[in-house]
Amino acid sequence: MENAKDFIGETIKENGLLTIEDDGSSSSDEEATLKRRLAGPSVLKSGQENVNQKKINEIIYEASKGSKFFEAEQKRDRELRLRIEKVQVEVEKYQSKLRFDKAFQREWTIRQESVDTTVEDFRAKRDLTQIIVHVDCDAFYASIEELKNPKLKSLPMAVGKSVLCTANYVARKFGVRSAMPEFIARKICPDLVVIPLNLSEYAIKSKEIQNVLAQYDSNLCPASIDEFYMNLTSHLRLQELAFTVENITMVVEKIRKQVHEETGVTVSCGIAANKLLAKIASNKRKPNNQFFIPFDEIGISKFMNDLPVREVSGIGRVLEQQLLGLEIKTCGDIQRNLVILSYIFLPKSFQNLLRCSYGFGTTILDEYGESKRKTIGSEATFSSNLSSPSIIEYKLRLLVQNVSENLQKRGLVTNSIAIKYKTSEFQVHTKQKSIGQFIHSESDLLKPALQLLRQSYPMTIRLLGVRATKLVSKSRCLAMQLKFQSQNTVPCPVCQKNIENELGILNQHVDLCLNVETVKSLINTDHTANPTIKKRKSNTLDTYFLE
């Protein structure tokens, strides 16, 4: 009995989740969480370290109050709070079982051993031999506009229309950031200069940057128009440089300097043993700097232990709020509470939490390859609501054109299309349709997209998107077609002649072959021509279809 008490006490002591107490919710708590939600996902963007976030949140809250957007976010925040409360109740249930249920205590021990084994398996498979670098352009769109007009460097400036895509570092000091509605940004910073998007120019500049980076890694992997992953392992070997911290940081500094000199754009870099860690590292010292995470288990463990969960790219806002509701604030907290989390979250979500908390990631840079790239999409937010079918369909055509160009550029095809739209009430809807063949052209993509769109009329929307899913490469698609064509005929199980592989035609032919007179005729012919040949054992339909 004493051992059982020790087990419970140590478990509760080590597992902070099991001591959660209900502090009572209030209207002020609801208001606080809603304000944080309205602040958006970009509050962690660099350049806002000295911003009075509480004041900015208050401005956003007051400016949004009474709008349909406010009501929609209020509803989502309420739903999230209820979900968190439900999880807290689950934790209390497990706490009680762990105290009084011996069977559950044994189950807990087994679960702990299973989790430990999973962690050790991940550790054993972790590759610490590759030098992965995440290159992130600093305020990319804004930087290009500043190159065109240097006067903008000293002014608070943002790029976008209706909703901001990015802001320069002067504007960020006021609290202006990406994904912020323009009218709210102007309340925060009345002198804000807003420049319209020029995506064609940004794409050209992105290509210039890629040309520089490709000199160090020919298998460069673009993650977006302004983010790139590199593997510098081969480069250091070719340069006969030892894999020391000094050599690695020196090469990355050289890359950053060359990008700036040749393109005018500054970049920040994260250096680590895998993509997940490199992505986290690139945000540590922005702008125009770099950060190195050690290439050993001890160094990685020390770094991850104190890392706030919000800084991990694999943990979104909703999941972060759920974790905070369970008093989990750092990746170390996740690690120490993996057993209880394995009960609360679905297996896929739990595996993601485990992987993220320990910094387990891939070193394979093939995000644009078909093995990793699952979808290609394009969407647009409109400055005013759209309700005219002709205008909506015109916008859809532009989006489909963009998706088609991206598919062709990457040598991919699709057999499934989806549309997404957000109504004037901020309700998001998605519809998807499978297609009987693989396609990539604008005209082929537009037809099913229009069918999905027209199912939803009448509608008033503020956002529209198109997405191609279930992607495969053109080469693989061609191989599949050739294989199908080669199997387009099959041998008859009776006479062995090749017959068109269509059920009706095949059945008709087999019926003919099985006709008694035909079989007799074939047998007589065989005996007359070769009376000494042994009779071959006849095939049966069962044998044929079972082969």
From Swiss-Prot:
Annotated Acidic residues bias: 20-31
Region (Disordered): 18-39
Keyword DNA damage: yes
InterPro entries: DNA/RNA_pol_sf (IPR043502), DNA_pol_Y-fam_lit_finger_sf (IPR036775), DNA_pol_Y-fam_little_finger (IPR017961), DNA_polymerase-Y (IPR050116), DNApol_IV (IPR022880), Rad18_UBZ4 (IPR006642), Rev_trsase/Diguanyl_cyclase (IPR043128), UmuC (IPR001126)
UniProt-recorded Gene Ontology molecular function terms: damaged DNA binding; DNA-directed DNA polymerase activity; zinc ion binding
Keyword Coiled coil recorded: yes
UniProt KW keywords: Coiled coil, Cytoplasm, DNA damage, DNA repair, DNA replication, DNA synthesis, DNA-binding, DNA-directed DNA polymerase, Magnesium, Meiosis, Metal-binding, Nucleotidyltransferase, Nucleus, Transferase, Zinc, Zinc-finger
Coiled-coil portions: none
Zn finger intervals (UBZ4-type): 489-518
Binding site for Mg(2+): 136, 226
SUPFAM superfamilies associated with the record: DNA/RNA polymerases (SSF56672), Lesion bypass DNA polymerase (Y-family), little finger domain (SSF100879)
Group of enzyme by EC: transferase
Enzyme Commission designation: 2.7.7.7
Cellular compartment(s): Cytoplasm; Nucleus
UniProt-listed Pfam families: IMS, IMS_C
Assigned GO CC terms: chromatin; cytosol; nucleus
Catalytic activity as recorded in UniProt: DNA(n) + a 2'-deoxyribonucleoside 5'-triphosphate = DNA(n+1) + diphosphate
Membrane-crossing segments per the record: none
Positions of the UmuC domain: 132-316
UniProt: Zn(2+) binding residues: 492, 495, 509, 513
PROSITE patterns associated with the record: UMUC (PS50173), ZF_UBZ4 (PS51908)
GO biological process: DNA damage response; DNA replication; error-free translesion synthesis; error-prone translesion synthesis; meiotic cell cycle; translesion synthesis
Subunit and partners: Interacts with hus1 and rad17.
NCBIfam families for the chain: PRK02406.1
Described function: DNA polymerase specifically involved in DNA repair. Plays an important role in translesion synthesis, where the normal high-fidelity DNA polymerases cannot proceed and DNA synthesis stalls. Has a role in meiosis.
Full protein name: DNA polymerase kappa
